[in-house]
Curated annotation (Swiss-Prot):
Family, as annotated: Belongs to the RecA family.
Protein's UniProt name: Protein RecA
Positions bound to ATP: G68, P69, E70, S71, S72, G73, K74, T75
Species per Swiss-Prot/TrEMBL record: Rhodococcus opacus (strain B4)
SMART domains: AAA
Record GO biological process: DNA recombination; DNA repair; SOS response
Length: 348
């Protein structure tokens, strides 16, 4: 005979009391208890990408994977997130497994290179152990691993060139992510894993592209970003940057599959002003007539490049446009200011 509702409630209360006693108060809670807080985020540096992510940036306390072809802008996006975290008073770490970090370029993107924690590990085990220890310190706001493909297991480094090491890297990533995810949530650290693309042999239907490091990173990531270069930006005959498209292929904190486009300028990174012009035109704050851009009767310039330079020089107008866009779309500092470490986000 099934137990009565009263008996079930009493049994549940006893079990919850015992769990709280053994593991601490709040180990189990009802999702509807208390006020739900917004998810704390780190802005990406592109307002269009912040909008595509649905919450105004990369979620704190989660795993994020950024992947794409070579020279598509993966590290640039990650470094902009680092710069924004530091600008808000946060501490950032960069695990440079590729041994290819350019401090001068990072500085141009706004990264405080003097305060940035950098490690250039010898093996994949060393890289992930360092990352885990930094996360468990509870002091870190953002951690970047560049890249997963360069996390070479110790056995492969110490072995001969022709030796087979099937599945070693995948097992290493799986074990590391099992350990890290809980610590990330507790510390509120955002872990960004930059990944490369490979092609599967013999695929007849569907995309042959796949990422390195096995399937664990796909499962543990709350956000996965596919970064592609779609166009070369030119000033006359000189190439000055790339038009970049980012697709949010996985998103556990907002609806997925949204896309964002923005400009990455050589030596400057993501053009914040270019993103504001694109979003301003899309949402009616900036008027485009022919090749002219106007804002509330004021001419910003003829052509996007001139309008971008105008906003670069007139930061008050730029900030005003940014504020209006964020208010309309419900993203930004005002919305995420109330976010706390114990926020309970809804997962999609």
């Amino acid at each position: 005979m099934a137990p009565q509702a009263h008996d079930r409630d009493k049994a549940l209360d006893l079990a919850l009391a015992q769990i709280d006693k053994n593991f601490g108060k709040g180990s189990v809670m009802r999702l509807g208890e208390g006020v739900r807080q917004p998810i704390a985020v780190i802005p990406t540096g592109s307002i269009s990408l912040d909008v595509a992510l649905g919450i105004g940036g990369l979620p704190r306390g989660r795993v994020v994977e950024i992947y794409g072809p070579e020279s598509s802008g993966k590290t640039t996006v990650a470094l902009h997130a680092v710069a924004n975290a530091q600008a808000a008073g946060g501490i950032a770490a960069f695990i440079d497994a590729e041994h290819a970090l350019d401090p001068d370029y990072a500085q141009k993107l706004g990264v405080d290179t003097d305060a940035l924690l950098v490690s250039q590990p010898d093996t994949g085990e060393q890289a992930l152990e360092i990352a885990d220890m930094l996360i468990r310190s509870g002091a870190l706001d953002i951690l970047v691993v560049d890249s997963v493909a360069a996390l070479v297991p110790r056995a492969e480094i110490e072995g001969e060139m022709g030796d087979s090491h099937v599945g070693l890297q995948a097992r290493l990533m799986s074990q590391a992510l099992r350990k890290m995810t809980g610590a990330l949530s507790n510390s509120g650290t955002t872990a960004i894993f930059i990944n490369q693309l490979r092609e599967k042999i013999g695929v007849m239907f569907g995309s042959p592209e796949t990422t390195t490091g096995g399937k664990a990173l796909k499962f543990y990531s709350s956000v996965r970003l596919d970064v592609r270069r779609i166009e070369t930006l030119k000033d006359g005959t000189d190439a000055v940057g790339n038009r970049t498209r980012v697709k949010v292929v996985k998103n556990k904190v907002a609806p997925p599959f949204k896309q964002a486009e923005f400009d990455i300028l050589y030596g400057q990174g993501i053009s914040k002003e270019g993103s504001l012009i694109d979003m301003g035109v899309e949402h009616g704050f900036i008027r485009k007539s022919g090749s002219w851009y106007t804002y509330e009767g004021d001419q910003l310039g003829q052509g996007k490049e001139n309008a971008r330079k105008f906003l670069l020089e007139n930061t008050d107008i730029r900030d005003e446009i940014e504020k209006k866009i964020k208010e309309k779309l419900g993203i930004g500092a005002d919305v995420t200011a109330a976010a706390t470490d114990d926020a309970a986000p809804v997962e999609f």
